[in-house]
Structure formats: structure tokens, C-alpha cells
């Protein structure tokens, strides 16, 4: 006997049930990245937001005035002669260090890429300035620049470049103080730039250089027409980090000269520390520090885009 139609009919499926899909769980990559994101935010993001907030207020150490000041702090520092001097010093020191470091790093990388006895020892000695703490090495340089017991003065006196009773004040004359800061920055950053450039030089195919050598290409032809064009993206990375390290460094200037004599050797980082922490004007100190942000961001974007274009081509 056949069943009634009502008992054999196929049950209706609701449209919501037909389109419903199982909920997608949070990907495991998210949980792996979360600690790093939180760490970076607490270390960089939160101080940056706090600096922006301070720079737009009237806050200082002795007065908790969080009232909105607009761009008054930025307008005030643009009319400050010491700030403009610090800005000129920062740009001058960064460009000088960049040029000297790139030239010396290319020469050292070319030498260290060749095989010779004692190459490992030379590479080890080259890395020592980078491994040493910046504060301790800068204190040692301060002794080297001492007006009476300076090793540099002794060498210059032995070479008869200066007289027996001349004592150049390396840290007491504005121009000599800037030269001293440049020397220490070059000594500090050169190992890092050399290692990066050396990695690029070693990555150049040996067959290409040997073919050029067979064709009669000399050393400088191979260097300027093969090696340097091929490692241009890596040189871009060295340029970026050298500029960032020099532009944002405060320790070398503060230990050597503390911005002296007469505030003539300040850079933006040391002047921001002087105004914001030593003098207690947190608002203007934050404004000076934030002045570096757009410059560094523009340099970083330009270098990274240049390097990316070179790799793509």
C-alpha cells in the first residue's frame, strides 16, 4: 500500500540554511604576529602618539597644561636660531658621513672580497667598532680629542703639521667640533656599511667578471660598469641605514660636546633632548623631535622605491 503524499515529500530547506557556511576560525598566523605587533606598538607607536599629543599642547615638567596649542610650538622653533643651526648641522653631518662612508665601504669591500692571507683577522678587526657600545667608544674618542694629551695632536706635531706649542681644541672650536663628530660617526657606521656592501660584491657572478677580464676590461672598468651597477640596490640599503643612524643619533654629540661650544654643534636629536628633558619644555622638545619624522619618512620611501625599481629591472 502506497504511503500518503504528505509522508513521502522532501522536507523544505530554508534559504538561510542553504547559504550558511561554517565560521572561519582566526588564522594561526594572526596569533603568531600579535605579540610582535603589540611590542612594536608599545615601543614605537605609543611614544609617537604621545609625542604628537605633547607637541600640540602647552605641557611642561612644571605645569601639566594639556590645553590645545595648535601649531604654536612648531612656529616657535622655526624662529629659534639654535634650532636652525641644529638643522643645518644635522644635514651637513649626515651628508658628509654618507659620502665618506660609501666611498670607504666600497674600497674596503673590494679589498676584502679578494683572497689574501689574514683576511679573516682583518674582517674581525673591522667589525670591532660596530660591536663596541657607542657610549664607551665615544668616551674613548673624547680622550683622543683631549686638548693636551690628544694622540691626534701628537701625530700632527711629529709630522710637523702643527708647531710644538700648538694645541688644537678639537671640541672647543665650532668647526673642529663638527669635524670631530663626523670622524666618530664615520668610525662607528663604516663596519656596518662595509659588511652590507661586501655581501653585494660577493653576490656578483664570478663568470661575468672573468669574461670581462678576458675581454681586456681593467679593474676600474669592471668596478664601475659591472660591480657597482649590479649592487646598486644593496648600496641603497646601506645609504638608508647610514642616513637613519646619523640623522637620529644623539649619543655621540651629547658625550663629545653636549652641543657646545655655545650651542654651535647641536643636532636635532641633541637639541630636542636639551629642550624637552634638560630644560623641561616637553611640548617644544616633542615638536623638535617630530620635525625629523617627515624628513626620515621621505628618505626611506625614496630609497626603498629606488631599490625596488632596480630589483624589478
Report each predicted region and the residues it spans.
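Short, Lys/Arg-rich, polar N-terminal cytosolic tail immediately upstream
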Residues: 1-25
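A structural signal for multi-pass alpha-helical bundles of membrane permease subunits
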Residues: 25-313
Amino acid at each position: 500500500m502506497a504511503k500518503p503524499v504528505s509522508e513521502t515529500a522532501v522536507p523544505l530547506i530554508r534559504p538561510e540554511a542553504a547559504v550558511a557556511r561554517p565560521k572561519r576560525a582566526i588564522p594561526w598566523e594572526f596569533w603568531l604576529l600579535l605579540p610582535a605587533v603589540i611590542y612594536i606598538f608599545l615601543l614605537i607607536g605609543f611614544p609617537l602618539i604621545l609625542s604628537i599629543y605633547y607637541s600640540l599642547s602647552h605641557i611642561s615638567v612644571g605645569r601639566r597644561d594639556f590645553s590645545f596649542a595648535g601649531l604654536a610650538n612648531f612656529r616657535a622653533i622655526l624662529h629659534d636660531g639654535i634650532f636652525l643651526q641644529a638643522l643645518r648641522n644635522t644635514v651637513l653631518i649626515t651628508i658628509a658621513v654618507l659620502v665618506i662612508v660609501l666611498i670607504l665601504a666600497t674600497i674596503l669591500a673590494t679589498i676584502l672580497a679578494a683572497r689574501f692571507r689574514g683576511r679573516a683577522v682583518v674582517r674581525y678587526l673591522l667589525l670591532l667598532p660596530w660591536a663596541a657600545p657607542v657610549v664607551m667608544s665615544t668616551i674613548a674618542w673624547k680622550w683622543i680629542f683631549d686638548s693636551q694629551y690628544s694622540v691626534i695632536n701628537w701625530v700632527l706635531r711629529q709630522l710637523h703639521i702643527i708647531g710644538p706649542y700648538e694645541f688644537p681644541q678639537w671640541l672647543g672650536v665650532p668647526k673642529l667640533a663638527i669635524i670631530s663628530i663626523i670622524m666618530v660617526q664615520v668610525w662607528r657606521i663604516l663596519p656596518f656599511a662595509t659588511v652590507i656592501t661586501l655581501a653585494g660584491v660577493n653576490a656578483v657572478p664570478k663568470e661575468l667578471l672573468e669574461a670581462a677580464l678576458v675581454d681586456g676590461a681593467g679593474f676600474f672598468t669592471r668596478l664601475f660598469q659591472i660591480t657597482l651597477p649590479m649592487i646598486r640596490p644593496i648600496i641603497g640599503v646601506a645609504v638608508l641605514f647610514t642616513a637613519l643612524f646619523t640623522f637620529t643619533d644623539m649619543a655621540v654629540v651629547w658625550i663629545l660636546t653636549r652641543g657646545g661650544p655655545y650651542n654651535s654643534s647641536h643636532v636635532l636629536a641633541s637639541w630636542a633632548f636639551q629642550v624637552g628633558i634638560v630644560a623641561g619644555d616637553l611640548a617644544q622638545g616633542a615638536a623638535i623631535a617630530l620635525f625629523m619624522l617627515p624628513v626620515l619618512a621621505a628618505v626611506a620611501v625614496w630609497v626603498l622605491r629606488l631599490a625596488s625599481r632596480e630589483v624589478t629591472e
